[in-house]
Amino acid sequence: MNRTLVLLIAFLLLGGGVFWYLSQGEDEKTTLAGADRDFAVKDIGQVYKIFIADRRGERTTLERRDGYWLYNGQYKARPSVMQPLLDAITRVQIKYQPPQAAMDKMVEALATEGIKVELYDKDGALIKAYYVGGSTSDERGTYMIMDGAEQPYVAHLPAWEGNLSVRLRRYGDEWRDKTLFSEEVDNIQSVSIEYPKQRNQSFILEDTPDGYEIRPFYDITPEIRRPFKEGSAEAFLVNFESVGAEAFRNNYDGRDSISQLVPFSIITLVNKQGDTTQVKLHPIVKGNVIAQDAKSGEYVLYSSEIERYFANLNGQDFLLAQHLVLEKLFWGYTSFFQDRNLLN
């Protein structure tokens, strides 16, 4: 009886050990199998650096900063480009595992068209690395494979159709923020607007300990002695909170010749930290021709024809900007003072 009991206990222990061993092995197998399917990083707050490389040799590094992303260590990244990219990183899902017959085509597409994506955390540790390739014939799925894995998958974004690579495949200035001005009123130290052909309307507005001061830009312009319009300085400065360009034109053939022309306006903003932003605006007449009289320097048909400007930003970037966006900045020196007729 005692011998039978001992054998029974030994059998149960052995069986439990085998079950535990098999269970552990199955869990490990399941974990490994799931690792090559888990493309999404659910918490985008964990991602501090994104590295993207394609077969053309393009290399893109995006790094998280306080309130924005930095492109290639130098430029602010455009929010409207970053938002869909971050959305894809957090929501990408496996749609299905392709049949064996389709594997060769997928692997070939990933090899020839694949974009490598590497995601890093705050400490610089790699979170995930994978390749994003071509799309299915119906354009509703994208080929993806985890770095180091052998099994490719068809992935997608729920409630969105298209190839995920369009959210990754950007080049050069396409990544960059097109903002010309972005300052809160309380953080603006001064703004000057120079109109080279309308000097009497050029001015400097400055925040002083005694309040806002508006004075002529040119010394030869007589100062206006009429009372200020109440709230006019704040009404003007609020326009600088968000002013964006339409597109970069850094490779435009006529950039150098246009930059040598007398601009319509030179707008200079200095913030409370001492950072200066300057934009020189050159009007564009319909047909993309700069119409400037060689003798007088006056722009032809300016009042009715100007729809866009070339904007020279800080002497470094050349952009296209719309008149409808910029016109709110075109105040004159007299705009800040009460009308003479109202004082009589």
Model regions: which residues?
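Soluble, acidic/polar mature domains that operate outside membranes
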Residues: 1-344
